[in-house]
Amino acid sequence: LMLEDQLAVNLSSSVSNGATSFDTYTASDSFRTLNQFYGGEFGMIEKWWRDRWSLQVLGKFALGATTVSTRINGVTTATTSAGITSTFPGGVLAQPTNPGNERSLFAAAGEFGVTADYAIWSQFRLSVGYSLIYWTTVGRVTDQIDPSVNPQQFGGGTITSGPLEPSFNLWTTGFLAQGINAGLEYQF
């Protein structure tokens, strides 16, 4: 299994330094999580037939590890009214104090599915089904954003007092996916 989340935040503002001059600031934050499941899977498929109808039930269970890779990047560009441009590390919520990390955690996943099909004639079948997957341990991108920011970091500054914020703490949650499928099969 693999699940990827991405979020980008861009901010642009202008500050007046007098009657006609403006300084422009542009900040960009990028947040990305990539979850990959590695493990063993056990499952069973059972299929029943009755006349032209058939019903298939699928059940799977997997134990293993989820590797959660989190990348947080930010940059600020300042342009003065004289046209001088400077670039600094860190945007607004993405600062040098929270670059993200990679961690592997114990996880389990399960899948359930049911499919019914009907034989219109011996070579042609129609099917419809439902599937559900649950994954116990994933990192979602919005859970990794720390809204607390020490403003000393803005514009490339360093923290001389106060907390090292934003900080990175990996938060995980469960993930549920559902789907409906339809099929058309012709055998020749």
What name fits each language-model region?
Residues 1-4, 61-69, 132-136, 188:
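Transmembrane beta-strands of outer-membrane beta-barrel pores
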Residues 3-36, 66-107, 139-149, 153, ...:
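Extracellular/periplasm-exposed beta-strand and loop segments of Gram-negative cell-envelope proteins
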Residues 4-6, 29-31, 38-58:
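Amphipathic alpha-helical interface segments within eukaryotic helical scaffold
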Residues 38, 108-110, 132, 178:
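Transmembrane beta-barrel architecture of outer-membrane proteins
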Residues 40-46, 59-61, 112-118, 128, ...:
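Residues on the lipid-exposed face of transmembrane beta-strands in outer-membrane beta-barrel proteins
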Residues 51-57, 106, 122-124, 178-180:
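Outer-envelope beta-barrel architecture signal
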Residues 126-132:
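Internal, hydrophobic beta-strand segments that form the core of beta-sheet-rich folds
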Residues 173-188:
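Outer-membrane beta-barrel "beta-signal"
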